[in-house]
């Protein structure tokens, strides 16, 4: 099938409207989404995170999931967005570690981590947090 343009689906549209309204109202987006399997929420969240990271200076984006393959898969979404950007708007990428870190010329960056590390993400200022498969995280207390 190949790469297709992103058009929000029926599940994503209300989330997008809510995100934009929240951004307008308080200047940031905070959404916790409980969902069924495969409605494209990681794609949606990566799109918002990529927009903020690629087009704004000094944004630290952190992606966390229960295991390395899932984290690498989500990082791949950011990677694809970056690779498909028009060169006219694409920031340079002076540092890149496939599947785990991307540093951009606008001083923004994307890091990833596994939730099985209780200290993951500490010591960083995080502006965009994308947590995936939270029900599978090792250190959650009921």
Residue ranges: model-predicted function:
Residues 1-142:
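Phosphate/NTP-binding elements of NTP-utilizing enzymes
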């Amino acid at each position: 099938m190949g790469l297709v343009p992103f058009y929000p689906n029926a599940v994503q549209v209300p989330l997008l409207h809510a995100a934009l309204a929240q951004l307008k109202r308080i200047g940031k987006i905070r959404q916790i989404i409980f969902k069924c399997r495969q409605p494209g929420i990681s794609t949606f969240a990566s799109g918002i995170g990529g927009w903020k990271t690629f087009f704004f200076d000094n944004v630290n984006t952190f992606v966390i999931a229960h295991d390395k393959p899932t984290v690498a898969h989500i990082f791949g979404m950011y990677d694809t967005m970056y690779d498909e950007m028009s060169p006219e708007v694409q920031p340079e990428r002076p540092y890149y570690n496939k599947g785990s870190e991307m540093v951009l010329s606008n001083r923004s960056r994307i890091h990833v981590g596994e939730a099985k590390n209780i200290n993951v993400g500490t010591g960083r200022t995080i502006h965009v947090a994308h947590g995936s498969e939270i029900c599978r995280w090792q250190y959650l207390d009921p």
